[in-house]
Amino acid sequence: MNWKEKVKTKFYSCDRFVRFVIQHFIQDDCTYIASALAFTSLLAVVPLMSVGLAIFSSFPVFQGLAEPVQNFIFDNFVPATGKIVQSYLQQFTSQVSKLSIWGVVFLIFTALLVMFTIERAMNKIWRVSSSRHGVSAFLLYWAIISLAPVLLGLSLAASSYLFSMPILADHRAPYTILHYSPFFLSLIGFTFLYVVVPNCPVKIRHAFWGGLVAAILFESAKHAFAYYLIRYNTYELLYGAFATVPIFFIWVYWVWIITLLGAEISYAFSVHHQRRGGKSLDGFSHALLWLHQLWIAQQHGKGLSFNDLVDASKQPFAVDVDEMINALIYHELIHATADGHYMLSRDLSHVTLYDLTQLLPYRLPTHLELQYSKASLSEQWRAAFKRHNEELKKSLDINLEELFKKTGTILK
């Protein structure tokens, strides 16, 4: 393959990737989910700040850093209107100490509700049917809410210590680090979100690429939004003193659009098999191929991971891989192990090809599909399917008019 063909192949691969991301972004209703998350976030921003500041202030080492942390967040992550929003939120959070025990419980519940909504959105993108429940969900949500301010405080404390060192104080390095720190914190935050929140394994490198795109878009959106507010602030003309509320809501909405787009990119990297080119492998051949690979693995006393099954064929799959796994599990042909691998659940010496046709909701491959599956199916399989198609053709070689004449009149 010469360099022109390589460039052409890469171009088509990138084109399929972009189309895949856009298609799934639309299919998953990400714009609608972003609006729901923006509304929920506005309701929970005061509870989240209150819980975060309470945890932050409980550590003596962070005494005196609460205000710098707030200033850093609103200066670097909320464009233009950050100071106004910050002053309002500080007024609201100052009233938290006057709440009753039930008021505090409601604040914590609202903060956890945001995390639950975020997890549902991520699970929808990653095609996960069930969310976390009970103690595991509470521990994860609470860990994220409680660790975020602590980690941010540690990073600021470490930065302050480094900047005060004589060896760095006279150099430009601290200012360069400070200038780019919002971008790197955004990158870490997005990557962490894509790895931890979905209720399924996500590789760090896949989450990183989604986080990188999201962080770049986030920084670009900050500057674009600030430029718009300075030059073309129509909301201030319309709403006057109340303009801060719709402006802040629109900004939060765009942040969630960017976050969900980054999640779709991470998901696209995770399911590379769905972006393959060429003719698709039919559902029945797909199932048979997986059972064959699991049977081989069983001979060596081991199971196969999801990626092992996906890589069994280089063709794209006509049936969604998650749907295929659920179908095989439902009919008790395979099961998932504790370590996330898959193994056979039946003795295949007692399962015939006919049994498989009756169990699975997929028809046998047609003559045309067999021609496109030479790379994935053995000659023995293709010969068996061909004999079946020929025998089926002989059995059903009767035209519909003749069939209907023999049936007689049913409707009166």
From Swiss-Prot:
Xref: PANTHER family: INNER MEMBRANE PROTEIN YHJD (PTHR30213), UPF0761 MEMBRANE PROTEIN YIHY (PTHR30213:SF0)
What keywords are annotated for this sequence in UniProt?
A: Cell inner membrane, Cell membrane, Membrane, Transmembrane, Transmembrane helix
Q: Which residues cross the membrane?
A: 36-56, 99-119, 137-157, 177-197, 210-230, 241-261
Q: Which GO terms describe its cellular component?
A: plasma membrane
List the InterPro entries: UPF0761_bac, Virul_fac_BrkB
Localization (cell): Cell inner membrane
- Tell me what organism the protein belongs to: Legionella pneumophila (strain Corby)
- NCBIfam families attached to this UniProt entry: yihY_not_rbn (TIGR00765)
Highest taxon listed in the record's lineage = Bacteria
Name used for this protein in its record: UPF0761 membrane protein LPC_2650
Membrane association type:
Multi-pass membrane protein
